[in-house]
C-alpha cells in the first residue's frame, strides 16, 4: 500500500476543548447564561415539527460522532468528519427507520471542520484541518484513505481559537477557507491571515480575499456567485451577522489588519486607521471607506448565540417554500435561522427569521442532499449547547405541509412588503395594530458583544393588502438606514383556518432605502422625533468626550415635541420660541 503523509504538525492528535465565543457569559454586554441557553417552548417545537420533521440518527456507543462536516454522496451515502479527527462513510441515513452502518475512511486529522468532493479531474476529498488544507484519496480501493496530500499550509500559533473552516468550492475551481482569529494573547493575529477569507488554487497557492472576520464558522457561495459568511458575537462583533464578502473587504474585526500590509493583500486599511468606535458600524463606515457592515444582523439570543453553517436551499421546492433562501445554523442554541436577501442600490440587505429549533445538540455543519432534506452535524464539547445529547447527526425533512409564515420581507421607500406562504386573513391584515415595528442597532467596539442600542418605534401609518392576500405593504415613519428593524405581525391570521404565523417576527437590516413610489407622502402631517440619541463616538484622537449622562438627568424624556405645518407650509413655532 502506497502512502503519502501531510506535513501536519505532531500536535494534530491533541484533543482541544474550545469555544466559538469563550467566556461570553462573563462579559458585561452579554445576557446571562440562562438567557443565552433558554429552551424553546414545547408548543413551538411541536408546531415546527409538523412541517419540518427532525429524524435523529442513532450512533453506535463506541463512536464519538462530534460531526463537523457532512458530504452527501451518490447512492444515499454520507461522508462525515468529526472534531476528533476521524472521517466516516455512513450508510442507512436515508431510510424511513434509519439504522446506520459506519466505515472509517481516515483518522488522525487535526480537528477538520468541513469536507467536499474534489472536482474532476482531481480525485478524492478536501478537508480543512487547523494547519493545512488536505486532499484525501483511496487509491487502492480498500475503503481507507492512503493519500494525505498537503495542498496548502495554514499558519497557526497554537492558540486554541485558531479554527479553519471549509473548504468551499468556488465557481472557478479554486477552494476557499475562513480562518479564526486567536484569542487571549497579546495579539489575536500572531501569524499571517488570521481573521481572513483565503482563496487556494489547486496547486496550493494561497491568496487573501477579505479581512475583519472573527469566528466565521459558516460561509457559502450562492447560486448567483455571491459569497456570504456568518460570524460569532464577540469583541468588535456586536451580535451574530451574515456579511457579503468581496475581494478587498474589511468587515469589522481589526486583528487581521496586522497582515494587510503583506504582499498580495487586497485590503487597504491598516491597524492605525481604526480610531473610531463606540458607534453603530454603519456610521463609522460612512467616515471610514473600506469598512463593510453586515448584509443581515442575527440578533443575539433571538436567532442564536454562536452562528455557524450557512447553506442555500437549492432543492427547487423539495424542502418547502423557501427555495433560494439561506439557512444559518447555530451551535449554542441548537437551532436554524432563515435569511432572505435582496440587493438595493448595489448593497445586499435582507431579513432574518426563526425557522427550526429543538435539535438534540449544537449545530456546527449543514448539508443538503439531492432529495432536498438537510443533515445537521452536532457537537457541544467545550462550547455548551441546548439539547439532551453531546454530539450526533440528524436529518431534517419537509413533511409536505406549508405553514403560514412570512416568506420574505422586502424594503420600500417608506416601509416594507411582507410576503406570505399562504393567503392572509384580510380583516386582521388591514389593521395597523396587527403590526409593531421598531428599529435598533449594535455598537462597534472592542468590548465583547453589544446590547441592542438606540431602539425606537416605527409607527405603522398605512397598510395595503394585496388582492390575492399573499402580501401586505406597510408604510412606516421613523425608519433608519443602517438599522435592524424588528417587524412583528402577531395579530395576523391565515385566510384558511385562522392560524397565527408560525414565526411572527422578522428582523430586516435596512442598509439602503430603495427608490420607488411611496404610499404615504414624504411631508407627513406629523413628524415624530423618534431617533434615539446616539452616544458620543470614542476616538483615539479625542481629548474630551463625555461617557456618562449628567447626574441630574432623569430617565424620562423632558418633553416630546411634535412639529406640524400650518396653512402655507409654515411651522407652528409656539413650542420652539419660548
Name these PLM-found stretches:
Residues 1-7:
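N-terminal secretory signal peptides that target proteins for export/translocation
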Residues 27-403, 407-415, 426, 470, ...:
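Beta-propeller domains with acidic blade repeats across secreted/periplasmic ectodomains
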Residues 478-483:
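Surface-exposed, short loops/turns at beta-strand junctions within beta-sandwich domains
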Residues 494-531:
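Extended, polar beta-sheet/loop recognition surfaces of beta-rich domains
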Amino acid at each position: 500500500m502506497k502512502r503519502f503523509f501531510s506535513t501536519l504538525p505532531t500536535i494534530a492528535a491533541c484533543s482541544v476543548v474550545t469555544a466559538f465565543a469563550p467566556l461570553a457569559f462573563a462579559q458585561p454586554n452579554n445576557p446571562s447564561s440562562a438567557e443565552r441557553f433558554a429552551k424553546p417552548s414545547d408548543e413551538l417545537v411541536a408546531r415546527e415539527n409538523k412541517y419540518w420533521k427532525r429524524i435523529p440518527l442513532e450512533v453506535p456507543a463506541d463512536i464519538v460522532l462530534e460531526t463537523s462536516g457532512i458530504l452527501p454522496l451518490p447512492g444515499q451515502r454520507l461522508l462525515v468528519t468529526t472534531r476528533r479527527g476521524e472521517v466516516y462513510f455512513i450508510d442507512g441515513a436515508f431510510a424511513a427507520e434509519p439504522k446506520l452502518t459506519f466505515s472509517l475512511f481516515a483518522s488522525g486529522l487535526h480537528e477538520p471542520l468541513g469536507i467536499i468532493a474534489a472536482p474532476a479531474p482531481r480525485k478524492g476529498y478536501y478537508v480543512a484541518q487547523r494547519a493545512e488544507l488536505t486532499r484525501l484519496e483511496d487509491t487502492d480501493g480498500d475503503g481507507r484513505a492512503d493519500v494525505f496530500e498537503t495542498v496548502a499550509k495554514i499558519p497557526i500559533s497554537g492558540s486554541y481559537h485558531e479554527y479553519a473552516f471549509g473548504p468551499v468550492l468556488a465557481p472557478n475551481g479554486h477552494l476557499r477557507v475562513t480562518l479564526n482569529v486567536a484569542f487571549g494573547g497579546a495579539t489575536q493575529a500572531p501569524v499571517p491571515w488570521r481573521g481572513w477569507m483565503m482563496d487556494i488554487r489547486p496547486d496550493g497557492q494561497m491568496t487573501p480575499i477579505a479581512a475583519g472576520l472573527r469566528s466565521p464558522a459558516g460561509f457559502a457561495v450562492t447560486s448567483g456567485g455571491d459569497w456570504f459568511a456568518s460570524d460569532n458575537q464577540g469583541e468588535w462583533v456586536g451580535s451574530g451577522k451574515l456579511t457579503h464578502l468581496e475581494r478587498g473587504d474589511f468587515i469589522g474585526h481589526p486583528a487581521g489588519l496586522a497582515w494587510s500590509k503583506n504582499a498580495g493583500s487586497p485590503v487597504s486599511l491598516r491597524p492605525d486607521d481604526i480610531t473610531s468606535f463606540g458607534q453603530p458600524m454603519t456610521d463609522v463606515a460612512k467616515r471610514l471607506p473600506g469598512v463593510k457592515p453586515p448584509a443581515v444582523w442575527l440578533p443575539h439570543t433571538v436567532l442564536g448565540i454562536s452562528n455557524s453553517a450557512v447553506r442555500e436551499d437549492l432543492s427547487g421546492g423539495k424542502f418547502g417554500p423557501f427555495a433560494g433562501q439561506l439557512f444559518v445554523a447555530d451551535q449554542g442554541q441548537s437551532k436554524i435561522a432563515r435569511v432572505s436577501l435582496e440587493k438595493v442600490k448595489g448593497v445586499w440587505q435582507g431579513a432574518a427569521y426563526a425557522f427550526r429549533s429543538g435539535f438534540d445538540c449544537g449545530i456546527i455543519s449543514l448539508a443538503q442532499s439531492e432529495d432536498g432534506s438537510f443533515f445537521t452535524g452536532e457537537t457541544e464539547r467545550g462550547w455548551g449547547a441546548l439539547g439532551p445529547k453531546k454530539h450526533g447527526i440528524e436529518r431534517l425533512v419537509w413533511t409536505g405541509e406549508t405553514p403560514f409564515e412570512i416568506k420574505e420581507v422586502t424594503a420600500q421607500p417608506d416601509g416594507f412588503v411582507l410576503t406570505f406562504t399562504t393567503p392572509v386573513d384580510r380583516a386582521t391584515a388591514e389593521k395597523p395594530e396587527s403590526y409593531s415595528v421598531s428599529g435598533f442597532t449594535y455598537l462597534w467596539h472592542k468590548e465583547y458583544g453589544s446590547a441592542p442600542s438606540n431602539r425606537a418605534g416605527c409607527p405603522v401609518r398605512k397598510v395595503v393588502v394585496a388582492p390575492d392576500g399573499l402580501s401586505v405593504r406597510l408604510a412606516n415613519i421613523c425608519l433608519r438606514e443602517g438599522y435592524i428593524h424588528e417587524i412583528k405581525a402577531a395579530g395576523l391570521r391565515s385566510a384558511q383556518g385562522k392560524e397565527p404565523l408560525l414565526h411572527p417576527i422578522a428582523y430586516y437590516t435596512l442598509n439602503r432605502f430603495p427608490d420607488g413610489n411611496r404610499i404615504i407622502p414624504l411631508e407627513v402631517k406629523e413628524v415624530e422625533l423618534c431617533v434615539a440619541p446616539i452616544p458620543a463616538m470614542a476616538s483615539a484622537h479625542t481629548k474630551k468626550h463625555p461617557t456618562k449622562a449628567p447626574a441630574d438627568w432623569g430617565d424620562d424624556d423632558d418633553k416630546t415635541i411634535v412639529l406640524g405645518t400650518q396653512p402655507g407650509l409654515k411651522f407652528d413655532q409656539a413650542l420652539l420660541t419660548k
